[in-house]
Amino acid sequence: MTQAATLTQQQLQRVLDYTRTRRHYKRNRAIILLTHYAMLRVGEVAALRYCDVVDADGEIKAETTLSAAQTKGNKARKVWFAEKIRVELAAYVAAHKPKQLTQPLFYTQRSEGFTANTLTHIVNGIYKHAGISGATSHSGRRTGLTNLAERGVGVRVLMALAGHSNM
């Protein structure tokens, strides 16, 4: 299997521009940016709940801790939300007020949380329709980590951000 494509800033902008023309654009922009800037796996995005991103005062958190059940490696890990993500999450949350803070952050028309598989199809479709060849649901995570590595971020920091315990 080939590696997911990494995106240039221009390609990411094309993807974000494309999402603006579609239904559920606030949700889709937030999902794309969570994979790119928080370097979350699609399964981790699907597992997010409102309480993971919104504090008791209704503000978007700067960081959160994903539980072991929410991560691929079954190990809790800390995730940081860049300002770009917080702005998009705030726009999404303002338009989709939760009934309960424990409810899934991203949900279907029946108010059920998306499965990782469904979100994979959504993200892959966004990349395809935006004309990004070779991009998959893993491209955002790979792009974010690659960009940090190219800027000289240390391997141990990258491992922590990625939730990897081994090189």
Where are these regions (language model features)?
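Short basic/aromatic active-site micro-motif
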Residues: 27, 133-151
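DNA breakage-rejoining catalytic core of tyrosine-based enzymes
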Residues: 1-13, 73-82, 99-101
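Conserved tyrosine-mediated DNA breakage-rejoining catalytic core shared by Y-recombinases
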Residues: 47-85
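C-terminal catalytic core of Y-nucleophile DNA break-rejoin enzymes
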Residues: 70-90, 102-124
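Alpha-helix N-cap/helix-start motif at helix boundaries, enriched for small hydrophobics
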Residues: 31, 43-48, 158
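Short, polar N-cap/turn motifs at the start of nucleic acid-interacting alpha helices
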Residues: 53-55, 133, 154-167
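Basic, Lys/Arg- and aromatic-enriched nucleic-acid-binding interface segment
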Residues: 9-38, 42
